[in-house]
UniProtKB/Swiss-Prot annotation:
Homodimer. InterPro entries: Aro_prenylTrfase, Aro_prenylTrfase_DMATS, DMATS-type_fun, Trp_dimethylallylTrfase. It is an enzyme of class 2 (transferase). This is Tryptophan dimethylallyltransferase 2. Substrate binds at R100, K186, Y188, R264, K266, Y268, Q350, Y352, Y416, Y420. The gene is dmaW2.
Length: 450
Protein backbone atom coordinates (compact mmCIF):
# COMPACT_ATOMS: atom_id res chain seq x y z
CA UNK A 1 0.00 0.00 0.00
CA UNK A 2 2.76 2.45 0.95
CA UNK A 3 4.72 1.55 -2.20
CA UNK A 4 1.65 2.08 -4.40
CA UNK A 5 0.99 5.46 -2.83
CA UNK A 6 4.63 6.45 -3.34
CA UNK A 7 4.53 5.39 -6.99
CA UNK A 8 1.40 7.47 -7.58
CA UNK A 9 2.95 10.51 -5.94
CA UNK A 10 6.03 10.17 -8.12
CA UNK A 11 4.24 10.45 -11.48
CA UNK A 12 3.99 14.25 -11.54
CA UNK A 13 7.37 14.71 -9.87
CA UNK A 14 9.14 12.23 -12.15
CA UNK A 15 7.73 13.81 -15.29
CA UNK A 16 8.57 17.29 -13.99
CA UNK A 17 12.20 16.26 -13.60
CA UNK A 18 12.22 14.63 -17.04
CA UNK A 19 10.43 17.15 -19.25
CA UNK A 20 11.96 20.08 -21.06
CA UNK A 21 9.65 22.93 -21.99
CA UNK A 22 9.66 25.06 -25.11
CA UNK A 23 9.06 28.25 -23.12
CA UNK A 24 8.21 29.50 -19.67
CA UNK A 25 4.47 29.75 -20.37
CA UNK A 26 4.33 26.02 -21.05
CA UNK A 27 6.37 25.34 -17.90
CA UNK A 28 3.94 27.39 -15.83
CA UNK A 29 0.90 25.67 -17.36
CA UNK A 30 2.36 22.28 -16.46
CA UNK A 31 3.09 23.08 -12.82
CA UNK A 32 -0.25 24.88 -12.46
CA UNK A 33 -2.45 22.06 -13.75
CA UNK A 34 -0.60 18.73 -13.68
CA UNK A 35 -0.76 18.20 -9.88
CA UNK A 36 -4.56 18.14 -9.91
CA UNK A 37 -4.64 16.19 -13.18
CA UNK A 38 -2.48 13.45 -11.67
CA UNK A 39 -4.49 13.45 -8.43
CA UNK A 40 -7.78 12.95 -10.29
CA UNK A 41 -6.29 10.13 -12.37
CA UNK A 42 -5.16 8.50 -9.15
CA UNK A 43 -8.58 8.96 -7.54
CA UNK A 44 -10.21 7.32 -10.57
CA UNK A 45 -7.88 4.29 -10.27
CA UNK A 46 -5.95 4.74 -13.49
CA UNK A 47 -2.90 2.50 -13.67
CA UNK A 48 0.57 3.99 -13.24
CA UNK A 49 1.19 3.37 -16.94
CA UNK A 50 -2.03 5.19 -17.92
CA UNK A 51 -1.14 8.14 -15.69
CA UNK A 52 2.23 8.51 -17.37
CA UNK A 53 0.62 8.11 -20.79
CA UNK A 54 -2.10 10.75 -20.31
CA UNK A 55 0.13 13.28 -18.57
CA UNK A 56 2.74 12.89 -21.30
CA UNK A 57 0.15 13.50 -24.03
CA UNK A 58 -1.11 16.50 -22.08
CA UNK A 59 2.38 17.98 -21.87
CA UNK A 60 3.32 17.27 -25.48
CA UNK A 61 0.08 17.84 -27.40
CA UNK A 62 -2.19 20.03 -25.24
CA UNK A 63 -0.10 22.49 -23.24
CA UNK A 64 1.47 23.99 -26.41
CA UNK A 65 -2.09 25.02 -27.37
CA UNK A 66 -3.08 26.73 -24.10
CA UNK A 67 -1.54 30.08 -25.02
CA UNK A 68 0.23 32.46 -22.68
CA UNK A 69 0.02 31.69 -18.99
CA UNK A 70 -2.80 33.85 -17.55
CA UNK A 71 -2.00 36.72 -15.22
CA UNK A 72 -4.23 39.47 -13.89
CA UNK A 73 -2.71 42.18 -16.04
CA UNK A 74 -1.37 40.34 -19.08
CA UNK A 75 -3.18 40.18 -22.40
CA UNK A 76 -4.59 36.76 -23.25
CA UNK A 77 -7.32 35.03 -25.21
CA UNK A 78 -10.42 34.71 -23.01
CA UNK A 79 -12.10 31.33 -23.36
CA UNK A 80 -15.77 30.66 -22.59
CA UNK A 81 -14.68 27.38 -21.01
CA UNK A 82 -14.49 28.92 -17.53
CA UNK A 83 -15.76 32.07 -15.87
CA UNK A 84 -12.14 33.18 -15.49
CA UNK A 85 -11.51 32.83 -19.22
CA UNK A 86 -8.94 30.06 -18.77
CA UNK A 87 -8.80 27.54 -21.65
CA UNK A 88 -8.49 24.27 -19.68
CA UNK A 89 -10.86 22.33 -17.40
CA UNK A 90 -10.77 18.89 -15.80
CA UNK A 91 -13.90 16.86 -15.16
CA UNK A 92 -14.56 13.52 -13.50
CA UNK A 93 -17.29 11.00 -14.25
CA UNK A 94 -17.80 9.84 -10.67
CA UNK A 95 -20.03 6.88 -11.50
CA UNK A 96 -17.62 5.26 -13.99
CA UNK A 97 -14.37 6.80 -12.69
CA UNK A 98 -13.50 8.32 -16.07
CA UNK A 99 -11.43 11.49 -16.30
CA UNK A 100 -12.01 14.03 -19.06
CA UNK A 101 -10.40 17.32 -19.86
CA UNK A 102 -11.56 20.06 -22.19
CA UNK A 103 -9.51 22.82 -23.75
CA UNK A 104 -9.81 25.57 -26.32
CA UNK A 105 -6.82 25.29 -28.68
CA UNK A 106 -4.92 28.57 -28.95
CA UNK A 107 -1.86 29.35 -31.07
CA UNK A 108 0.32 32.32 -31.94
CA UNK A 109 -2.17 33.62 -34.52
CA UNK A 110 -5.13 33.57 -32.12
CA UNK A 111 -6.52 37.06 -31.61
CA UNK A 112 -4.25 38.60 -34.25
CA UNK A 113 -5.29 39.85 -37.68
CA UNK A 114 -4.44 36.39 -39.01
CA UNK A 115 -7.08 34.69 -36.85
CA UNK A 116 -8.93 37.33 -34.81
CA UNK A 117 -11.60 34.94 -33.50
CA UNK A 118 -9.55 31.76 -33.04
CA UNK A 119 -11.19 29.90 -35.90
CA UNK A 120 -8.23 27.91 -37.16
CA UNK A 121 -5.97 26.87 -34.26
CA UNK A 122 -8.10 23.79 -33.70
CA UNK A 123 -6.91 22.25 -36.98
CA UNK A 124 -3.28 22.38 -35.86
CA UNK A 125 -4.23 20.88 -32.48
CA UNK A 126 -6.18 18.09 -34.16
CA UNK A 127 -3.23 17.13 -36.32
CA UNK A 128 -1.14 16.50 -33.20
CA UNK A 129 -3.82 14.27 -31.70
CA UNK A 130 -4.49 12.39 -34.94
CA UNK A 131 -0.78 11.62 -35.21
CA UNK A 132 -0.75 10.23 -31.66
CA UNK A 133 -3.73 7.88 -31.83
CA UNK A 134 -5.55 6.16 -34.73
CA UNK A 135 -9.32 6.13 -35.16
CA UNK A 136 -10.08 9.86 -35.03
CA UNK A 137 -12.66 10.70 -37.70
CA UNK A 138 -13.26 14.32 -38.76
CA UNK A 139 -16.28 13.87 -41.03
CA UNK A 140 -18.94 15.25 -38.71
CA UNK A 141 -16.52 17.71 -37.15
CA UNK A 142 -15.73 19.17 -40.57
CA UNK A 143 -19.43 19.43 -41.39
CA UNK A 144 -20.38 21.26 -38.20
CA UNK A 145 -17.26 23.43 -38.34
CA UNK A 146 -18.31 24.65 -41.78
CA UNK A 147 -21.93 25.17 -40.73
CA UNK A 148 -21.38 26.83 -37.35
CA UNK A 149 -18.04 28.67 -37.28
CA UNK A 150 -16.66 31.57 -39.27
CA UNK A 151 -14.85 31.08 -42.54
CA UNK A 152 -11.87 33.28 -43.41
CA UNK A 153 -13.97 35.91 -45.23
CA UNK A 154 -16.53 36.17 -42.42
CA UNK A 155 -13.77 36.45 -39.84
CA UNK A 156 -12.05 39.24 -41.77
CA UNK A 157 -15.34 41.09 -42.25
CA UNK A 158 -16.38 40.97 -38.59
CA UNK A 159 -12.92 42.09 -37.52
CA UNK A 160 -12.63 44.95 -40.03
CA UNK A 161 -16.11 46.25 -39.23
CA UNK A 162 -15.62 45.87 -35.46
CA UNK A 163 -18.89 43.96 -35.19
CA UNK A 164 -17.90 41.70 -32.29
CA UNK A 165 -18.54 43.29 -28.90
CA UNK A 166 -19.58 41.19 -25.89
CA UNK A 167 -20.47 38.05 -27.82
CA UNK A 168 -18.92 34.69 -27.00
CA UNK A 169 -15.71 34.65 -29.02
CA UNK A 170 -14.90 30.99 -28.42
CA UNK A 171 -15.98 29.00 -31.47
CA UNK A 172 -14.69 25.51 -30.81
CA UNK A 173 -13.16 23.35 -28.09
CA UNK A 174 -11.84 19.81 -27.85
CA UNK A 175 -12.31 17.25 -25.08
CA UNK A 176 -10.52 13.98 -24.36
CA UNK A 177 -12.33 11.20 -22.49
CA UNK A 178 -9.58 9.08 -20.97
CA UNK A 179 -10.44 5.39 -21.18
CA UNK A 180 -7.68 3.12 -19.94
CA UNK A 181 -4.51 4.40 -21.58
CA UNK A 182 -6.39 5.67 -24.67
CA UNK A 183 -8.59 8.69 -25.29
CA UNK A 184 -11.84 9.37 -27.15
CA UNK A 185 -12.02 12.80 -28.76
CA UNK A 186 -15.03 15.08 -29.05
CA UNK A 187 -15.65 18.68 -30.01
CA UNK A 188 -17.87 21.50 -28.75
CA UNK A 189 -18.91 24.24 -31.17
CA UNK A 190 -20.35 27.67 -30.31
CA UNK A 191 -22.11 29.45 -33.22
CA UNK A 192 -22.40 32.90 -31.60
CA UNK A 193 -20.08 34.62 -34.07
CA UNK A 194 -21.54 32.74 -37.02
CA UNK A 195 -24.85 34.19 -35.92
CA UNK A 196 -23.42 37.71 -36.10
CA UNK A 197 -21.94 37.04 -39.54
CA UNK A 198 -25.05 35.45 -41.08
CA UNK A 199 -27.87 37.26 -39.29
CA UNK A 200 -29.35 33.91 -38.27
CA UNK A 201 -30.02 33.13 -34.63
CA UNK A 202 -27.91 30.55 -32.80
CA UNK A 203 -31.09 28.47 -32.57
CA UNK A 204 -31.57 28.55 -36.35
CA UNK A 205 -27.96 27.63 -36.98
CA UNK A 206 -27.80 24.72 -34.54
CA UNK A 207 -31.13 23.15 -35.39
CA UNK A 208 -30.73 23.89 -39.10
CA UNK A 209 -27.35 22.15 -39.24
CA UNK A 210 -28.63 19.07 -37.42
CA UNK A 211 -31.79 18.99 -39.54
CA UNK A 212 -29.66 18.85 -42.70
CA UNK A 213 -27.50 16.11 -41.19
CA UNK A 214 -30.57 14.10 -40.16
CA UNK A 215 -31.85 14.16 -43.73
CA UNK A 216 -28.73 12.23 -44.74
CA UNK A 217 -28.38 10.15 -41.57
CA UNK A 218 -31.99 9.17 -40.99
CA UNK A 219 -31.13 7.09 -37.91
CA UNK A 220 -30.99 10.29 -35.80
CA UNK A 221 -34.01 11.97 -37.39
CA UNK A 222 -36.79 10.75 -35.03
CA UNK A 223 -34.89 11.86 -31.92
CA UNK A 224 -34.09 15.22 -33.50
CA UNK A 225 -37.71 15.83 -34.47
CA UNK A 226 -38.91 15.06 -30.94
CA UNK A 227 -36.36 17.49 -29.48
CA UNK A 228 -37.27 20.18 -31.99
CA UNK A 229 -40.96 19.75 -31.19
CA UNK A 230 -40.23 20.13 -27.47
CA UNK A 231 -38.16 23.28 -27.91
CA UNK A 232 -40.75 24.84 -30.21
CA UNK A 233 -43.51 24.12 -27.71
CA UNK A 234 -41.50 25.69 -24.89
CA UNK A 235 -40.63 28.78 -26.87
CA UNK A 236 -44.16 29.68 -27.94
CA UNK A 237 -45.63 29.58 -24.43
CA UNK A 238 -46.05 33.04 -22.82
CA UNK A 239 -43.58 33.51 -19.98
CA UNK A 240 -44.32 34.82 -16.50
CA UNK A 241 -41.84 35.40 -13.70
CA UNK A 242 -43.13 32.43 -11.69
CA UNK A 243 -43.32 30.01 -14.62
CA UNK A 244 -40.80 27.29 -15.36
CA UNK A 245 -41.73 27.61 -19.03
CA UNK A 246 -39.10 30.20 -19.87
CA UNK A 247 -37.83 30.09 -23.47
CA UNK A 248 -35.02 27.65 -24.15
CA UNK A 249 -32.05 28.96 -26.12
CA UNK A 250 -29.44 26.95 -27.99
CA UNK A 251 -25.94 27.50 -26.66
CA UNK A 252 -23.66 24.97 -28.34
CA UNK A 253 -23.42 21.60 -30.07
CA UNK A 254 -21.04 18.68 -29.65
CA UNK A 255 -20.19 15.47 -31.47
CA UNK A 256 -17.74 12.60 -31.13
CA UNK A 257 -14.80 12.52 -33.52
CA UNK A 258 -15.38 8.92 -34.52
CA UNK A 259 -17.07 7.25 -37.48
CA UNK A 260 -20.47 8.83 -38.27
CA UNK A 261 -22.12 5.45 -37.63
CA UNK A 262 -20.96 5.67 -34.00
CA UNK A 263 -20.78 9.41 -33.38
CA UNK A 264 -23.33 11.10 -31.14
CA UNK A 265 -24.67 14.59 -31.67
CA UNK A 266 -25.53 16.58 -28.54
CA UNK A 267 -27.52 19.81 -28.56
CA UNK A 268 -27.08 22.05 -25.51
CA UNK A 269 -29.92 24.27 -24.32
CA UNK A 270 -29.76 27.09 -21.81
CA UNK A 271 -32.52 27.22 -19.17
CA UNK A 272 -32.68 30.53 -17.33
CA UNK A 273 -35.15 29.32 -14.73
CA UNK A 274 -33.28 27.44 -12.01
CA UNK A 275 -35.95 25.37 -10.28
CA UNK A 276 -36.85 21.76 -9.73
CA UNK A 277 -40.00 21.98 -11.92
CA UNK A 278 -37.89 23.47 -14.74
CA UNK A 279 -35.35 20.66 -14.42
CA UNK A 280 -38.13 18.06 -14.38
CA UNK A 281 -39.51 19.56 -17.58
CA UNK A 282 -36.07 19.39 -19.23
CA UNK A 283 -35.66 15.79 -18.09
CA UNK A 284 -39.01 14.56 -19.41
CA UNK A 285 -39.08 16.82 -22.50
CA UNK A 286 -42.31 18.31 -21.26
CA UNK A 287 -43.82 14.88 -20.58
CA UNK A 288 -42.69 13.24 -23.82
CA UNK A 289 -40.43 10.83 -21.92
CA UNK A 290 -42.37 8.77 -19.40
CA UNK A 291 -40.78 5.31 -19.39
CA UNK A 292 -39.56 3.60 -16.22
CA UNK A 293 -35.94 4.64 -16.77
CA UNK A 294 -37.01 8.28 -17.02
CA UNK A 295 -38.96 8.02 -13.76
CA UNK A 296 -36.05 6.37 -11.94
CA UNK A 297 -33.68 9.07 -13.14
CA UNK A 298 -36.15 11.76 -12.13
CA UNK A 299 -36.20 10.47 -8.56
CA UNK A 300 -32.41 10.79 -8.41
CA UNK A 301 -32.58 14.33 -9.80
CA UNK A 302 -34.98 15.25 -7.01
CA UNK A 303 -32.62 13.61 -4.52
CA UNK A 304 -29.63 15.57 -5.83
CA UNK A 305 -31.59 18.81 -5.86
CA UNK A 306 -32.40 18.35 -2.19
CA UNK A 307 -28.89 17.30 -1.18
CA UNK A 308 -27.31 20.24 -2.99
CA UNK A 309 -29.87 22.63 -1.54
CA UNK A 310 -30.14 24.48 -4.84
CA UNK A 311 -31.39 28.05 -4.67
CA UNK A 312 -34.20 28.64 -7.21
CA UNK A 313 -34.60 31.76 -9.29
CA UNK A 314 -34.45 33.31 -12.75
CA UNK A 315 -30.80 33.58 -13.83
CA UNK A 316 -28.85 35.15 -16.67
CA UNK A 317 -25.25 34.79 -17.79
CA UNK A 318 -23.26 37.88 -16.77
CA UNK A 319 -21.37 39.23 -19.77
CA UNK A 320 -17.85 40.01 -18.51
CA UNK A 321 -15.42 37.34 -17.39
CA UNK A 322 -14.34 37.25 -13.77
CA UNK A 323 -10.83 38.59 -13.13
CA UNK A 324 -8.29 36.03 -11.96
CA UNK A 325 -8.50 35.87 -8.20
CA UNK A 326 -12.05 37.21 -7.95
CA UNK A 327 -14.34 35.35 -5.57
CA UNK A 328 -17.65 34.76 -7.38
CA UNK A 329 -20.82 36.35 -6.13
CA UNK A 330 -23.19 34.99 -8.74
CA UNK A 331 -25.30 32.03 -9.70
CA UNK A 332 -25.69 30.98 -13.30
CA UNK A 333 -28.53 29.50 -15.39
CA UNK A 334 -29.17 25.80 -15.75
CA UNK A 335 -28.38 23.82 -18.86
CA UNK A 336 -29.26 20.51 -20.47
CA UNK A 337 -27.97 18.58 -23.42
CA UNK A 338 -29.79 16.02 -25.53
CA UNK A 339 -27.98 13.15 -27.21
CA UNK A 340 -29.31 11.97 -30.56
CA UNK A 341 -28.48 8.27 -30.63
CA UNK A 342 -28.68 6.31 -33.85
CA UNK A 343 -31.92 4.31 -34.14
CA UNK A 344 -33.35 5.64 -30.89
CA UNK A 345 -36.49 7.77 -31.37
CA UNK A 346 -36.15 9.55 -28.02
CA UNK A 347 -33.40 12.08 -27.20
CA UNK A 348 -31.39 11.23 -24.11
CA UNK A 349 -31.23 14.16 -21.64
CA UNK A 350 -28.39 15.21 -19.43
CA UNK A 351 -29.15 17.97 -16.95
CA UNK A 352 -26.68 20.31 -15.28
CA UNK A 353 -26.78 21.58 -11.71
CA UNK A 354 -24.98 24.93 -11.87
CA UNK A 355 -23.13 25.03 -8.55
CA UNK A 356 -20.49 27.66 -9.38
CA UNK A 357 -20.60 30.24 -6.60
CA UNK A 358 -21.93 27.75 -4.03
CA UNK A 359 -19.85 26.64 -1.04
CA UNK A 360 -17.54 23.87 -2.25
CA UNK A 361 -17.44 22.00 1.05
CA UNK A 362 -21.23 21.83 1.12
CA UNK A 363 -21.28 20.63 -2.49
CA UNK A 364 -18.61 18.03 -1.70
CA UNK A 365 -20.51 16.76 1.33
CA UNK A 366 -23.73 16.52 -0.69
CA UNK A 367 -21.99 14.55 -3.43
CA UNK A 368 -20.31 12.24 -0.93
CA UNK A 369 -23.66 11.48 0.65
CA UNK A 370 -25.13 10.75 -2.79
CA UNK A 371 -22.21 8.44 -3.60
CA UNK A 372 -22.68 6.54 -0.35
CA UNK A 373 -26.42 6.14 -0.85
CA UNK A 374 -25.85 4.62 -4.27
CA UNK A 375 -22.95 2.41 -3.19
CA UNK A 376 -20.21 4.25 -5.03
CA UNK A 377 -18.13 3.55 -1.96
CA UNK A 378 -14.70 4.01 -3.54
CA UNK A 379 -15.55 7.47 -4.86
CA UNK A 380 -17.30 8.36 -1.60
CA UNK A 381 -14.12 7.56 0.33
CA UNK A 382 -11.78 9.48 -2.00
CA UNK A 383 -13.61 12.48 -3.44
CA UNK A 384 -13.18 14.99 -0.64
CA UNK A 385 -9.51 14.11 -0.16
CA UNK A 386 -8.90 14.45 -3.90
CA UNK A 387 -10.07 18.06 -3.93
CA UNK A 388 -8.38 18.96 -0.65
CA UNK A 389 -5.07 17.59 -1.92
CA UNK A 390 -5.51 19.43 -5.21
CA UNK A 391 -5.73 22.73 -3.29
CA UNK A 392 -3.76 21.92 -0.11
CA UNK A 393 -3.03 25.47 1.03
CA UNK A 394 -6.57 26.80 0.99
CA UNK A 395 -9.40 27.00 3.44
CA UNK A 396 -11.58 24.51 1.61
CA UNK A 397 -14.54 25.27 3.87
CA UNK A 398 -14.65 28.81 2.44
CA UNK A 399 -14.09 28.14 -1.28
CA UNK A 400 -16.93 28.61 -3.78
CA UNK A 401 -15.35 28.32 -7.24
CA UNK A 402 -13.93 24.77 -7.48
CA UNK A 403 -17.15 23.12 -8.70
CA UNK A 404 -18.64 24.66 -11.85
CA UNK A 405 -21.30 22.13 -12.88
CA UNK A 406 -22.62 18.75 -11.86
CA UNK A 407 -24.15 16.81 -14.74
CA UNK A 408 -26.58 13.90 -14.41
CA UNK A 409 -27.95 11.37 -16.87
CA UNK A 410 -29.53 7.93 -16.55
CA UNK A 411 -29.43 5.13 -19.08
CA UNK A 412 -29.56 1.35 -19.06
CA UNK A 413 -30.80 1.45 -15.46
CA UNK A 414 -27.68 3.27 -14.32
CA UNK A 415 -27.01 6.86 -13.20
CA UNK A 416 -24.10 8.86 -14.60
CA UNK A 417 -22.80 11.83 -12.64
CA UNK A 418 -19.88 14.08 -13.56
CA UNK A 419 -18.28 17.07 -11.87
CA UNK A 420 -16.59 19.95 -13.72
CA UNK A 421 -13.77 21.49 -11.74
CA UNK A 422 -11.66 24.63 -11.52
CA UNK A 423 -8.26 23.41 -12.74
CA UNK A 424 -5.84 26.30 -12.35
CA UNK A 425 -2.89 26.80 -9.97
CA UNK A 426 -3.27 23.50 -8.15
CA UNK A 427 -1.07 21.47 -5.84
CA UNK A 428 1.66 23.48 -4.15
CA UNK A 429 0.82 26.55 -6.21
CA UNK A 430 -1.27 29.22 -4.42
CA UNK A 431 -4.50 29.65 -6.34
CA UNK A 432 -5.14 33.32 -5.76
CA UNK A 433 -2.00 35.11 -4.59
CA UNK A 434 -1.85 38.71 -3.48
CA UNK A 435 0.53 39.59 -6.30
CA UNK A 436 -0.12 39.62 -10.02
CA UNK A 437 1.00 36.03 -10.46
CA UNK A 438 1.62 33.08 -8.20
CA UNK A 439 5.25 32.02 -7.90
CA UNK A 440 6.42 35.26 -9.48
CA UNK A 441 9.94 34.28 -8.52
CA UNK A 442 9.56 31.18 -10.69
CA UNK A 443 8.73 33.34 -13.68
CA UNK A 444 11.97 35.26 -13.17
CA UNK A 445 14.13 32.29 -12.20
CA UNK A 446 13.53 29.40 -14.59
CA UNK A 447 15.66 27.04 -12.52
CA UNK A 448 13.07 26.71 -9.75
CA UNK A 449 11.18 24.30 -12.00
CA UNK A 450 12.91 22.52 -14.83
Amino acid sequence: MVLAKTLHQEVYQTLSETFDFANNDQRLWWHSTAPMFQKILQTANYSIYAQYQHLSIYKSHIIPFLGVYPTRSGERWLSILTRYGTPFELSLNCSDSIVRYTYEPINAATGSHLDPFNTFAIWEALKKLIDSQPGIDLQWFSYFKQELTLDANESTYLHSQNLVKEQIKTQNKLALDLKGDKFVLKTYIYPELKSVATGKSVQELVFGSVRKLAQKHKSIRPAFEMLEDYVQSRNKVPTTDDSHNTPLSSRLLSCDLVSPTKSRVKIYLLERMVSLPAMEDLWTLGGRREDQSTIEGLEMIRELWGLLNMSPGLRAYPEPYLPLGAIPNEQLPSMANYTLHHNDPIPEPQVYFTVFGMNDMEVTNALTKFFMRHEWSDMASKYKACLRESFPHHNYEALNYIHSYISFSYRNNKPYLSVYLHSFETGEWPVFPEGLIAFDGCRRDLTCYK
